[in-house]
Amino acid sequence: MSTTEPAAPVAPLDITATEEWAALTTHLREISEVSLRDLFAADPRRGETFAAEADGLYLDYSKNRLTARTVELLTALARRAGLADRIEAMFRGERINVTENRPVLHVALRAPAGTRIEVDGVDVVPDVHRVLDAMSQFADRVRSGDWLGATGERIRTVVNIGIGGSDLGPAMAYDALRDYADRSIEVRFVSNVDPTDIWEATADLDPASTLFIVSSKTFTTLETISNARAARSWLTGLLGEDAVSRHFVAVSTNAEKVAEFGIDTVNMFEFWDWVGGRYSVDCAIGLSLMIAIGPPNFREFLAGFAAMDTHFRTAPFERNLPVLLGLIGLWYRDFFGTATHAVLPYSHYLGRFPAYLQQLDMESNGKSVDLTGRPVSTPTGPIVWGTPGTNGQHAYYQLLHQGTTIVPADFIGFVRPNHPGVGTADGAGVDQHALLLANFLAQTEALAFGRTAAEVAAEGVTPDLVAHRTFPGNRPSNTLLAQKLTPFALGQLIALYEHKVFTQGVIWGINSFDQWGVELGKVLAGRIIPELGSEQEPELGHDSSTNALIKRLRAG
């Protein structure tokens, strides 16, 4: 049960000073010269042994530079860090976000009805389902044509206005689940304060058939409210002030500000301060997604999250997908010294998934002090990046295979396609999805095992080209495989990475649920805005570079 008092920071444990860390350091020296070729040659069943599964989501982590002893030592490190207790603390609604004195309960957003999760002694799950029901009713009205615009037109376009978690999550999920969307309603997303964004989003729209969803917890976020005002001006300039109530709804906690804007608070869908922005796609922030794919599919999406939540909470660490991914990532970040992590989905629909994970991971674990404010003693969150396969193969895979930087990677694939493809890929009866999967598998194999100089020479390559066509291999990767990209599978994947990030944050002893690093830029921007716009020459008090740039911008 949560209390109003902040949870005491988990023991300010210097994880690098533990016996478990020392054992891993010693083990690294033992394994550093062992290649993946050696490991697979020594164990013909390695590909089956180093694998785990949860509700149809399969993880093959055999192509990593680790052994059973590595997994044993890493899981011991997780236990030493108190991971099991921290998992329970989160699910119990304790205020584990200690810098903001808040519970962290995105898991409540997808908890089945009847589950009990308390904040300050109050079960929050009924409230979650009340909002879900309200969202469902509204989404059904829009989809059926019962909700009409001010002139009696059906809604044909929904424009979601938000930024950060209010944009990245729903935009990613909308793209991912387009195969399940009602194609008679288009959803667009506006986030950038650059006026080009809102201009392009509305340039070809009919205001009479456009619905805006303004998503902002406080309804004061600079970029979001600026874009919302621009959208309001565009709409009222064509339809009049009275049209606002039929063409704007809000996702917020600030009813007063919503009403001031002109949105009827009956059409405000709430969420709670125990929901972080980057963990909010499965609450009212996902209203645009629910309108697109329909309430039943949205609830399947939530069911995927919930299944992974249960797995994370109950599975032994040795078979726990989020824990394994977190520990493997930490193994490379802290012991091998890798700085980046690639996420490579072999699905065109998951084009925005790496960008979504950038916020989830880098905003959560991009921290340099621990829970007590002391400098951390080891590197924390990696740089996360990636694009869909096979496009990336023709861009940066060259560096992955033959560059001097080791980049651990997650490959994500699906057994069955959402679309079968037209004709065959090569004229020999191989369809496009099989071609995609062949590349998906080939890349992990090539990264792991490479090609030796002797193998290249044996193919008849001229001696002057042998070095250029040799692949060092020993490049690590995980393979994630689901049957098909469905709402359930997407929910699983998102929750998998949420809990991976949490696992790493616990071991590093940092707060994965605040984001103070975004604040300073906002404060300084607040100073600069009037300096750029004032009629009188302002007295500038910045550094010489910023002062000179402001003067150049003012000069036009």
From Swiss-Prot:
Major subcellular site: cytoplasm
InterPro entries, sorted: G6P_Isomerase, G6P_Isomerase_C, Phosphoglucose_isomerase_CS, SIS_dom_sf, SIS_PGI_1, SIS_PGI_2
Keywords tagged on the record: Cytoplasm, Gluconeogenesis, Glycolysis, Isomerase
GO terms for biological process, alphabetical: gluconeogenesis; glucose 6-phosphate metabolic process; glycolytic process
A molecular function GO annotation: glucose-6-phosphate isomerase activity
CDD domains in the cross-refs: SIS_PGI_1, SIS_PGI_2
GO CC, any one term: cytosol
Record-linked PROSITE patterns: P_GLUCOSE_ISOMERASE_2, P_GLUCOSE_ISOMERASE_3
Enzyme Commission number: 5.3.1.9
Class of enzymatic activity (EC top level): isomerase
Subcellular location: Cytoplasm
Similarity section: Belongs to the GPI family.
Enzymatic reactions: alpha-D-glucose 6-phosphate = beta-D-fructose 6-phosphate
Gene: pgi
One Pfam family named in its UniProt record: PGI
Name the UniProt record assigns to this protein: Glucose-6-phosphate isomerase
